[in-house]
Design a protein with these regions (language model features):
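S-adenosylmethionine/decaboxylated-SAM
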Residues: 3-5, 10, 14-155
């Protein structure tokens, strides 16, 4: 295990300015992330939440099978999933131990996993939901509809 985070792609950083403003305004302590890939956005959210709260929670939904763009580009999705796990493990070993940080990996398709969360009583639970899973229009719409049920009022 290394002590450094490793990311082989960056489809996230361009979102940081807008997300920093959202984080500063909402101050979420419970996030649902749809699409985690190697964990770059997961780490961003954890760092931001831990700057504000002593107890944080993030649920990460991803199939780690890849979308059309990953398959066409020849991504090793098993390797991507392993990198996610390594990055989260590395991050968790590096943060302030006086704070409580819960990361829940939920492997599977977002629609099924979000319905599962609803069935488990997570309706109106999350402060913020980040949707960056499938890039197919119908999938994104369904993710947004389910997210509406899972996010708390004002989130």
């Amino acid at each position: 295990m290394t002590n450094e985070l490793t990311f082989n792609s960056d489809w996230f950083t361009h979102n940081v300015p807008a997300l920093e403003a959202i984080m500063a305004d909402l101050k979420p302590s419970k996030i649902l992330e749809i699409g985690s890939f190697e964990g770059r956005s997961t780490v961003f959210f954890l760092e931001n939440m831990l700057n504000i709260h002593d107890k944080v929670e993030i649920h990460c939904i991803d199939s780690w099978l890849g979308g059309r763009e990953h398959i066409q580009s020849g991504w090793d999705m098993n390797g991507v999933e392993r990198q996610f796990e390594e990055n989260i493990r590395t991050f968790l070993h590096s943060f302030n131990e006086k704070k409580e940080c819960k990361v829940v990996k939920r492997k599977g398709y977002s629609h099924a996993k979000m319905i599962e969360l609803l069935a488990q009583g997570y309706e109106n639970y999350f402060d913020f939901i980040y949707v960056d899973g499938s890039h197919e229009a119908t999938d994104v719409l369904f993710d947004a509809l389910l997210a509406h049920r899972l996010v708390r009022g004002g989130g």
